[in-house]
């Protein structure tokens, strides 16, 4: 006989995959508790749907799986204040922003797992010698291969940094070359899996944290932009200014300035959304990058560095310095935060000296007294 099935409450929209570790996983009610209470009215939005895997299958799998880990309740749950409690804060703010600006239904699959290294997020041996018996690619990414994703948001790298804050020794963490190679391969891997060589892939650069040495991972995240096979629609969101009391976040105690989980997830999500609006939805007035180094020329005894930027360059506000060492230098008047710090120049002998740096428009002019 004939069988009739009826499906209701179905919407068609754009689907995003959220992957990485705890800064992507971080729940709205945990990372942004003061703002969460004020989201009660806006959170009720049936045009935003989520699959929140949470801890289900968080140990990964040694073999590719055809199905996602089984979850309780509605697989594509409409956004409610209750659901917002345990969803990714970045995913929540990102979806709300896109839905408001474009009017399109937005769905996202929240697959991130805290404390995970990059080797768990790509296909085993996609990069020779890089594999994990606890692969999250196998049970959280591979099962989605038939989805037509609009894009991927990725925030990861803390667990691949050196354990010794004063070491760049790759035995204590990944070298910049290692991580950038694997990061670029991960992007290629996902684009192959989803059969879309131009799949938008946006990832977050690590924020500064305490005195932890993440310079190698942050450098690697920049280098990956040049190593990926096809750079189209591969973009990095910089979070160097992201600390606990950013923008609309209500934390003003200062403690979050030294938290490995920056509280301003609404701002990170806004930056991700700017990229999506530009690349996917055709918003030509959206910014797509912070300042990016473009070229260098000499002018007598000076070096002139030119950057690509939407506006003129500026010095980071002193309240955005987020590591203990820098705070101590500021408090003891050993660091002048009204001038541009951090540039060094080397001569033919290869010895680097601190450089004087002056901002002029989109350029930085360097000189050295040595």
PLM region spans:
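Cell-envelope and extracellular/periplasmic
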Residues: 1-370
């Amino acid at each position: 006989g004939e069988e009739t099935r009826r499906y209701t409450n179905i919407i068609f929209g754009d689907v995003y995959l959220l992957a990485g570790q705890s800064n992507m996983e971080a729940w709205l009610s945990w990372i942004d508790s003061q703002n969460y209470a004020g989201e009660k009215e806006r959170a009720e939005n049936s045009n935003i749907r989520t699959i929140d895997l949470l801890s289900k299958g968080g140990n990964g799998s040694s073999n590719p799986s055809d199905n996602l880990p089984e979850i309780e309740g509605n697989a594509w749950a409409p956004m409610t204040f209750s659901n917002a409690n345990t969803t990714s804060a970045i995913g929540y703010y990102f979806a709300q922003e896109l839905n408001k600006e474009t009017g399109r239904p937005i769905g996202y699959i929240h697959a991130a797992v805290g404390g995970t290294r990059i080797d768990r997020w790509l296909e085993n041996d996609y990069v020779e010698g890089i594999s994990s018996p606890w692969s999250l690619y196998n049970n959280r990414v591979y099962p989605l291969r038939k989805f037509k994703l609009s894009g991927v948001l990725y925030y990861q790298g803390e667990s691949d940094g050196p354990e010794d804050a004063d070491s760049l020794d790759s035995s204590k963490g990944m070298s910049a070359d290692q991580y950038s190679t694997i990061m670029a391969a991960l992007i290629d891997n996902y684009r192959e899996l989803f059969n879309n060589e131009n799949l938008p892939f946006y990832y977050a650069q690590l924020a500064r944290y305490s005195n932890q040495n993440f310079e190698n991972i942050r450098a690697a995240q920049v280098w990956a932009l040049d190593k990926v096979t096809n750079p189209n629609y591969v973009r990095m969101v910089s979070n160097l200014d992201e600390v606990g009391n950013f923008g609309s976040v209500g934390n003003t105690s200062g403690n979050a300035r030294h938290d490995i989980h920056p509280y301003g997830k609404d701002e990170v999500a806004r930056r991700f959304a700017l990229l999506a609006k530009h690349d996917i939805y055709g918003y030509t007035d959206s910014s797509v990058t912070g300042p990016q180094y473009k070229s260098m020329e000499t002018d007598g005894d000076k070096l002139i560095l030119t950057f690509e930027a939407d506006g003129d360059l500026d010095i980071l506000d002193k309240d955005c310095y987020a590591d203990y060492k820098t705070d101590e230098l500021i408090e003891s008047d050993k660091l002048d935060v009204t001038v541009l710090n951090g540039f060094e120049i080397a001569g033919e002998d290869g010895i680097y000296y601190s450089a004087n740096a002056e901002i002029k428009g989109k350029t930085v002019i360097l000189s050295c007294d040595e």
